[in-house]
Amino acid sequence: PETEENRSFVRRLLLRLTETTDVVLLNPGLHLDDHWDLTPDVNRRVHSIERLVTPRNNLGVQTRVISGASAFIGNYGGLSYLAPMCGVRSLAFYSNPDGFSVHHLELAHRVFSKLKRGSFLALDVQALDMVGLVAGGLPLLSPELAGVDEA
């Protein structure tokens, strides 16, 4: 959902990712459904597909970008499912587990674990501090680590 916490999380994630790689935002710049497009204030190494997208070719352009990517990192949903089908690793985040069918998530894990290429992992953003503990004792994407002043 569009919340201040989620916008802050995405900003910190973009800052972290763009330290080492270029990021292509899959925002179509079109309002076709109930999804909102992030307008990041992070510009370094962030690229947009908006100028390439029309209502007719939107999904085709997104599919081609994902197919050529080394990884998909984004919100949990349709595009996070598409990435493993294209042989691309997918890391998806969600913040409201009541906002979707857990059965679909469990099924996705079972189906995508059988693929020879690509992978799928979906994480609740609330679990990131625990993941960070296991990954070296530092909270992942904490405001301090990302150099972001949350005040």
What do the PLM-derived regions correspond to, one by one?
Residues 67-73:
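Acidic donor-binding loop of glycosyltransferase active sites
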Residues 80-151:
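Nucleotide-sugar donor-binding patch of glycosyltransferase catalytic domains
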Residues 31, 78-79:
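Alpha-helix capping/helix-boundary segments
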Residues 20-21, 69, 87:
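Short, well-ordered alpha-helix to beta-strand connector turns
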Residues 1-4:
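Secretory-pathway luminal glycosyltransferase catalytic domains
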Residues 7-59:
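Catalytic donor nucleotide-activated moiety binding site of glycosyltransferases and closely related
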Residues 62:
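Acidic, amphipathic alpha-helical patches
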